[in-house]
Amino acid sequence: MKLSNIKSKEVVRILQKQGFEIKRQSGTHIIMRNNGKIVVVPIHKQIIPIETLKTIEKQSGINFREIIS
């Protein structure tokens, strides 16, 4: 799977495996938290844009490229 073809559900699943918990949903965004880190995942589109995914990587400290390879 290419990094540019990752879906919102997959991002949420990866974050949960890394210890993030869903705290709430605000409209079309899921707010997740782990040890003070807050990550916002948009769920209004099937595939997350690459720039948004880079922001999620920065917020979470997780490298999705390593996990999905």
Predicted regions located by residue number:
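Basic nucleic-acid-binding interfaces
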Residues: 1-69
